[in-house]
Amino acid sequence: MGAAIAIAGSVILRVLCGTNSRPDTLQAPIIVAFLIACVVAMLFGAFNGVLVAYFKIQPMVATLILYTAGRSIAAWINNNELPIVSDPTFSYFGGFIPGIPIPTPFFIAAACVLVIFLILKFTTLGLYTQSVGINENSSKLNGLNPTFIKFLTFVILGLCVAVAALIKVSRLSSINYSVIAKDIEMDAILAVALGGNSLSGGKFNMAASILGAYVIQFLTTTLYKFDVQSDALPAYKAVVVILLVVLSTPKVREWLSAVGKKLKQSKTIKEVG
C-alpha cells in the first residue's frame, strides 16, 4: 500500500510539474493530475487483483511484489528527481484552507468514509464482499463470482490509494520516495485488528476500524512524546500486531472463553456457599 501511494504521488507531481522539477506554475490542473493518478493506482490495484483472484497467489506474496518494486517505480517516473510544486493551492489538500480551522484531510477522509459506507451498506457489493469473505465456496454455490469480487476489491483499493497519495504529496508539495507512507501497511492491519474485525475476512465494522486508526495515531503520538525514535516505532507496533493476531485466533478465544466460564462458575459457587 505504501509503495502504491508513492507511485500515485509521483504521478501527481509528474503531471503537475511536467518536465521541469520546479516549475513556476502548474503544468496541468490538479483535478487532471489526480484523475490520472487514480487510473494508474487502479491499474496497479488490478495487477494485484489478478494475481490474487485469478492466479490464486496468496495476497501477502502478491502484494510483496509491488511492495518491493513500487518505490523504485515511483522514483523512475520523475527520473529520480524530487519535484516541487510552488502553487499554494496544492498545499490545501494536505493542510488547511485559509479561514477554516479544521484540516482539509479530515473532510476528505470523512467524504471517503461516507461514500464507502453507503456503497457497502446499501448496494449489493457490500453484501457480496462480506459473503465472499465469510465463505468463498458457499458464495460460489449461491451464484456469486468470488474471483471478480476479489479483483474489484483491489481496484477500489487503488482508488483509495490515489486519494491518500494526493494528501501525502500536498503536505510537502513534494515527495520523498523512500519515506512517504512508510510502514503504513502495519498501521492498516493494526486499525482493523483493534476495531475487532477478523483479519481472515468476513463481516466487518467500518466505524470500529476508524476508531482503531485513531488509536494507532494516538499510540504513535504518545511514543513520540516519550522521545521514541521514528526508526523504533515499527518494533513497538509489531509487538501490538503479534498480540492482537494471537488473541484473535480461534484457539486462544476458546481458551479465554473457557477461563471466563470457570471464573464465573467459581464465583457462583462462592455466592451460593
Predicted regions and their residues:
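Helix-loop-helix "hairpin" substructures at the membrane interface of multi-pass membrane proteins
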Residues: P29-A37, F44-N48, G99-N176
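Transmembrane alpha-helical segments in multi-pass inner-membrane proteins
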Residues: V161, L172, N176-A238
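Short loop segments and helix-boundary regions at transmembrane helix junctions
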Residues: L16-G18, T25-L26, M42-V85, I119-T124, ...
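Hydrophobic alpha-helical transmembrane segments
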Residues: A3-I7, I31-V39, V61, F106-A111, ...
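Cytosolic-side transmembrane-helix boundaries in multi-pass membrane proteins
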Residues: L141-F148, L219, L223-G273
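Hydrophobic core segments of alpha-helical transmembrane domains in multi-pass membrane transport
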Residues: G9-V11, C38-A41, Y67-S72, I108-L118, ...
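Transmembrane helix-bundle core of multi-pass membrane transporters
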Residues: I31, F55, P59-F122, I149-L152, ...
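Membrane-embedded helix boundary and interhelical linker motif in transport proteins
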Residues: M1-A46
